[in-house]
Amino acid sequence: PLPEGMEDDEYLQTLAQYLPDLLSNIQPDLVLYDAGVDPHIGDRLGKLALTNTGLFRRDMQVLSTCVAAGYPVACVIGGGYAEDMESLVYRHSLVHRAASEVFHQYRL
């Protein structure tokens, strides 16, 4: 398990360390990515301390890693237990923004 309170940079380094090998070993036909926002520092149930920027960078990293390796990705939103609905909606929008950027970056 990840340590409680893990912040953006450490989380993203951990993701970069494991995701490419995981994909290479499994070679999925399709990646189903649940872009939960409960790792956010403001989430009342989550145990990590990611910022909005960290969530966006995570989504970019996951999507870019998958697409660059040739794996199709389907994204869903999930998790997120903030009391401020506007903040929660914004956090859920980040994966859509990341997907749009990756789409244009890779000319899909």
Feature annotation, model-predicted:
Residues 1-108:
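A general "terminal functional-core" signal
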